[in-house]
């Protein structure tokens, strides 16, 4: 096993090859990686079977689905890499140019970060997405996968590096930390001088540990306690469709809805219809029904467990939905501001003034009017695959694509000027 220190030194030694690579070279790299990923399908599936067998019974079925790969999912991962090829190269983009009175020309241009570290949990697709985005944005990358997905991740990285071996870029621009202990995560958090940026992707415990302990600059990809508020002026059919999609299409992802707020004027008519869609109809279709966690008012209209205070601060990542009845738009916004992780929140309403108030007052990375929160995604936003959803405000906010993985520098051109 190569030590972490050796890996940090290896990636530092070769980072310039990707930091300054042309768009043509980087695209060749990505295409080779995609081809070798598909070519290694058999090996990746064998590794994934080992991870699945080890994880079964230890994590929920929803989380197992995150971990699971088949040939179609591997092809989708390769397709995601190829989609990044089609995106414009951000490196070298001129952001601003100005000329001073003394004749100096100052150009602000986009440059690579250098080396980016990614700590993530059991999602194999993050491996290929992270590699594609970091390399296309001119960065080398150090990956640290969760233990549950390590065999799969190792097989994926092996395939990607075989692709790199067919290009002019050194395979060491991608490093996979082989040690999946907590110590390896903490080593990355302290790797100042080796990592220029650290991005955690996972649950609240992982993200909080990185944010609280890292001395390397961090972009926080926060958890998603995502709200949908059904206003008194909502279209009921529209609201039912949005909630069904936001909660059930993929409950294990961070843009899935976790909390429903319903105006009290709507509760009596709307909540029984929602129960029909999310519980009865799903049972009839052989699908897992939604389990409600209800406040005292909501429990008057539908069946479910009584909500505990922590239910409104929980990212369930499962077929569970916390429901609260509110007396006004203002109460809904106040609840969101008290409990939100500032990821994605939505209002369903036909009232333009209510929509404007909601979008002005809710301080989240993505705020929706009459649409599912499941659209908070780099691909859906036209950014290609994403590095994560930033819930902080400095440097990057919302889905992080190529530009969010870059910095800038000033190039000052003169003709012998000196400062008096």
Swiss-Prot record:
Record GO biological process: L-proline biosynthetic process
Cited CDD domains: ALDH_F18-19_ProA-GPR (cd07079)
Keyword Cytoplasm: yes
EC numbers, comma separated: 1.2.1.41
Main location: cytoplasm
Protein family membership: Belongs to the gamma-glutamyl phosphate reductase family.
Protein's UniProt name: Gamma-glutamyl phosphate reductase
Organism: Streptococcus pneumoniae serotype 19F (strain G54)
UniProt gene name: proA
């Amino acid at each position: 096993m190569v030590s972490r220190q050796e890996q940090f030194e290896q990636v530092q030694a070769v980072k310039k090859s990707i930091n300054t690579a042309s768009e043509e070279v980087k695209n060749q790299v990505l295409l080779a990686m995609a081809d070798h990923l598909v070519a290694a399908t058999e090996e990746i599936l064998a590794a994934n079977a080992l991870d699945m067998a080890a994880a079964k019974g230890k994590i929920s079925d929803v989380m197992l689905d995150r971990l699971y790969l088949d040939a179609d999912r591997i092809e989708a991962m390769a397709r995601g890499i190829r989609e990044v090829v089609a995106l414009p190269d951000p490196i070298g983009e001129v952001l601003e140019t100005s000329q001073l009175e003394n004749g100096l020309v100052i150009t602000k241009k986009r440059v690579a970060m250098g080396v980016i570290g990614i700590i993530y949990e059991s999602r194999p697709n993050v491996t290929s997405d992270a590699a594609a985005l970091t390399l296309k944005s001119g960065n080398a990358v150090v990956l640290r996968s969760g233990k549950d997905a390590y065999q799969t991740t190792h097989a994926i990285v092996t395939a990607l590096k075989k692709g790199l071996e067919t290009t002019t870029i050194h395979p060491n621009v991608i490093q996979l930390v082989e040690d999946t202990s907590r110590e390896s995560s903490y080593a990355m958090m302290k790797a100042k001088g080796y990592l220029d940026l650290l991005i955690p992707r996972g649950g609240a415990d992982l993200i909080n540990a990185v944010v609280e302990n890292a001395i390397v600059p961090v972009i926080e990809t926060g958890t998603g306690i995502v709200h949908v508020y059904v206003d008194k002026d909502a279209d009921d059919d529209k609201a039912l469709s949005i909630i069904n999609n936001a909660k059930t299409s993929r409950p294990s992802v961070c843009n899935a809805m976790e909390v429903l707020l319903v105006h009290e004027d709507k509760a009596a008519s709307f909540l029984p219809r929602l129960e029909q869609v999310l519980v009865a109809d799903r049972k009839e279709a052989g699908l897992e029904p939604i389990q409600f966690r209800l406040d005292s008012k909501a429990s008057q209209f539908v069946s479910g467990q009584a909500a505990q205070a922590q239910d409104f601060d929980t990212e369930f990542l499962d077929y569970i939905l916390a429901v609260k009845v509110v007396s006004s738009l203002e109460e809904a916004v106040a609840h969101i501001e008290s409990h939100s992780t500032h990821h994605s929140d939505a209002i369903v309403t036909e009232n333009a003034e209510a929509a404007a108030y909601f979008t002005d007052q809710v301080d989240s990375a993505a705020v929706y009017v009459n649409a599912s929160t499941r659209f908070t995604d780099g691909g859906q936003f036209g950014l290609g695959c994403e590095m994560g959803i930033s819930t902080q405000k400095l440097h990057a906010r919302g889905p992080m694509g190529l530009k969010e993985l870059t910095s800038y520098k000033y190039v000052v051109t003169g003709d012998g000027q000196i400062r008096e």
